[in-house]
Amino acid sequence: MATIPDWKLQLLARRRQEEASVRGREKAERERLSQMPAWKRGLLERRRAKLGLSPGEPSPVPGTAEAGPPDPDESSVLLEAIGPVHQNRFIRQERQQQQQQQQRSEELLAERKPVPLEARERRPSPGEMRDQSPKGRESREERLSPRETRERRLGIGGAQESSLRPLEARDWRQSPGEVGDRSSRLSEPWKWRLSPGETPERSLRLAESREQSPRRKEVESRLSPGESAYQKLGLTEAHKWRPDSRESQEQSLVQLEATEWRLRSGEERQGYSEKCGRKEEWPVPGVAPEETTELSETLTREAQGSSSTGMEAAEQRPVEDGERGMKPAEGWKWTLNSGKAREWTPRDIEAQTQKPEPSESAEKRLESPSVEAGEGEAEKEEAGAQGRPLRALQNCCSVPSPLPPEDAGTGGLRQQEEEAVELQPPPPAPLSPPPPAPTAPQPPGDPLMSRLFYGVKAGPGVGAPRRSGHTFTVNPRRSVPPTTPATPTSPATADAAVPGAGKKRYPTAEEILVLGGYLRLSRSCLAKGSPERHHKQLKISFSETALETTYQYPSESSVLEELGPEPEVPSAPNPPAAQPDDEEDEEELLLLQPELQGGLRTKALIVDESCRR
């Protein structure tokens, strides 16, 4: 008998090997299925049945599946009803891909080759897949060699687009051993913001001063480099606006407390404010004056269209460009463009001298950015204690003003100062007319103020207008004899009462529709919700008999039968001047009398709709 040829032996050995691998695979699959939850097992079996595989076989590799004909129920995704999450088609597809990857790795393990470990390592972990995206790749490059990538990015112009988020996230991922490197990495965005010729030591110093305060770093990690640069500039400019170091220590403690968490310690704060005492020096630590002027010019350009908010608001929270304060805009305009404070024109000084005393001190506190150092020292000491609550008040209620920064020299000053005067608590005697102080500084042709105060005259019957947001609330005082309060009668009643000024003429029954004149009951206490939505289905009708029986209200006809018509109308000498508590009862009396006299020509029941608001 001839010996079996070599190739046949190899073939048989390979077949045995394949069978063993298939058996091992089936065993592993069975074990995996037994560990799975029941719903997942059923899902896999259904999928295998659909693909026509035997229960032991693994599902095909995704590459071959895609090469075949398209899945017939691919279109059924559109018709799919909302069901449990694990039955969602897209989630199932993701799970299938994961399972196919697992099965492939198990196949490679089952065949005894050197490939399996490599293959398992090759399979992309979620971290690597995240690194495929450009941002992740960027952060991976920076993790490998921060200095090279920094120089490369400085060469490229696109450095400013990279935000602080990847940097901060990388810093938080680092082990404690790498903390020493953190300051140099933190300084990168600042280095990108500055001109390329600047030395890294300066930006290192910047980063170290910022690193001391974790809260500051947190805020910056949420900002893009541009915004954090603006924020830092806002801080240093706000320090520069205080004219003298000793005065700024005493008088602007409010602001310093607000920004205290940004600075390292009390000594550094003193250093800052002493630096800021001299107007010509630029207080940005470690940044050359030329670069700061470049930055400041971009800031002035962007501050052109900005609106008015408080200076503390600009310091305490990272404000977007649209919300930049009018006062910071003025400060940039006047101090940064030329590098020194703008000279005061005689017109401005006139405008200052015209103003009354409280408003002058208020203006000194509010407009401190643009005051020259000598004037500011003298006048700020006047302002003293009273300016601080005003500043806080104005910070709460400041309103965006449509004035551009160029007009701010005149109109803006007056408007802000008027705000400050209006925000003072109202005078204690409510009936006396308010003093003419608020309107004194307003020039006759000022368009903004005439638009805001249009139709509001400070007369005897009107309280001082109070501001909340953009709205003016005018509170009329009621108990003044010459101005008659608006009684809630119908318009016909009002017209009828006018002609006979000497003799009181009360409305007849036809003139009274519903007491209060609310024909659609839109402002009625009986109507709930907004009248615009509900007035169509709102039909409120009163049946006299039903009212009488159900609620025990006697109708007027029964009252008339008992009493008979009264001979004369009890007329009060001056009903509108009565106390507001008695007003409503009196109106009811006066409006019911003519009805009783007229012998009930209309329906007997009158619905009183004039409920108090």
Curated annotation (Swiss-Prot):
Annotated positions of the Phosphothreonine modification: 199
N6-acetyllysine modifications at: 457
Protein name: Phostensin
Provenance organism: Macaca mulatta (Rhesus macaque)
Keyword Phosphoprotein attributed: yes
Subunit organization: Interacts with Protein phosphatase 1 (PP1).
Alphabetized UniProt keyword annotations: Acetylation, Actin-binding, Cytoplasm, Cytoskeleton, Phosphoprotein
Function (record text): May target protein phosphatase 1 to F-actin cytoskeleton.
Domain of life of the organism encoding this protein: Eukaryota
Amino acid composition bias (Basic and acidic residues), ranges on this chain: 15-33, 104-154, 167-191, 199-221, 266-282, 314-327, 340-350, 357-367
Segments of skewed composition (Polar residues): 301-310
Gene Ontology MF terms in the entry: actin binding; phosphatase binding
UniProt biased composition (Acidic residues): 580-589
Stretches for region Disordered: 15-231, 266-505, 552-594
Pro residues compositional bias, start-end: 424-446, 567-578
Positions of post-translational Phosphoserine modification: 54, 125, 133, 175, 195, 224, 368, 432, 490, 530
Localization annotation: Cytoplasm, Cytoskeleton
InterPro entries xref list: Phostensin/Taperin_N_dom, Phostensin/Taperin_PP1-bd_dom, PPP1R18/Tprn
Location (main, coarse): cytoplasm
A single cellular component GO annotation: cytoplasm
Compositionally biased tracts (Low complexity): 476-499
